[in-house]
Amino acid sequence: MTIKRKKVSVIGAGFTGATTAFLLAQKELADVVLVDIPQLENPTKGKALDMLEASPVQGFDANIIGTSDYADTADSDVVVITAGIARKPGMSRDDLVATNSKIMKSITRDIAKHSPNAIIVVLTNPVDAMTYSVFKEAGFPKERVIGQSGVLDTARFRTFIAQELNLSVKDITGFVLGGHGDDMVPLVRYSYAGGIPLETLIPKERLEAIVERTRKGGGEIVGLLGNGSAYYAPAASLVEMTEAILKDQRRILPAIAYLEGEYGYSDLYLGVPVILGGNGIEKIIELELLADEKEALDRSVESVRNVMKVLV
């Protein structure tokens, strides 16, 4: 008898993609297809087999395969895109955007062909622009093309707050709005420790330092690694979003969503609070922002639009 499980395809078998695949399997959320380019098919198969051989030890029942053939991804419930190139020495930001946009379009055509009903979650940077590129190429409803950055940025924000207060991260809630970059907007006013507003627990100058560290969080890890970038926390963030979709949890999470007038912006993807469930983005939640918060979000939107200008 064939066991019918949910199916998730992870495009890109690098550190983030492989870690995402393994976490999905460990949590028994779905059978997993790990995909990379033909030149990397054997290493991709090797990683998938290695994960599968961990299943008796870890005690999970989920099938994992590695492939370069998108036919193997057919009828995926969710497709996660982590593929793309990192910025190399001498490469301009515009070159990076143009190159990764071309990669996104090629991947998206294969996804749309084999899994026309899938929900797509994009991680590839610059993620706000790449999610927009995928949306335009796929022709899917906007609710089914989502970007991941807010869960990660908020996780970093919560981590730093928990460290500052010497509390469990489980008791820290917060939200980060805007683009995934130096102009992101951690919302201190909507952040709490055990239901207590942060502003009553942490001095203003320390909060400002935490906000700034959150904005530079990815760069801090890049600097420490010396080569490469973060992948454990990004993968965990992707899995949290994927689980909310597969289980129709209707969770309030920050996600990169297509805006059509919300927050006063249109025709762009931006990090905002959403209800995430079985249909993808079930609803965009509009928070009331103070003047300085709206100004900060305006700056973030301007940064995102500047990147989008070089999309191909």
UniProtKB/Swiss-Prot annotation:
Is Ribonucleoprotein included in the keywords of this UniProt record? Answer: no
Give a single Pfam family match: Ldh_1_N
* Reaction catalysis annotation: (S)-malate + NAD(+) = oxaloacetate + NADH + H(+)
Q: What is its EC number?
A: 1.1.1.37
Annotated catalytic residues: H180 (proton acceptor)
The record's section on SUPFAM superfamilies has: LDH C-terminal domain-like (SSF56327), NAD(P)-binding Rossmann-fold domains (SSF51735)
Task: Select a single GO molecular function from the record's annotations and give it.
Answer: L-malate dehydrogenase (NAD+) activity
GO BP terms: namely: carboxylic acid metabolic process; tricarboxylic acid cycle
Highest taxon of the source?
Bacteria
What keywords were assigned to this record? Answer: NAD, Oxidoreductase, Phosphoprotein, Tricarboxylic acid cycle
Q: Which Gene3D superfamilies match?
A: Lactate dehydrogenase/glycoside hydrolase, family 4, C-terminal (3.90.110.10), NAD(P)-binding Rossmann-like Domain (3.40.50.720)
Its Gene Ontology cellular component terms are: cytoplasm
Q: Which residues bind substrate?
A: R87, R93, N125, R156
Q: Which residues bind NAD(+)?
A: G12, A13, G14, F15, T16, G17, D36, N100, L123, T124, N125
UniProt lists the family membership as follows: Belongs to the LDH/MDH superfamily. MDH type 3 family.
What role is this protein assigned? Catalyzes the reversible oxidation of malate to oxaloacetate.
Q: What is this protein called?
A: Malate dehydrogenase
The opening ranks of the lineage are:
Bacteria, Bacillati, Bacillota, Bacilli, Bacillales
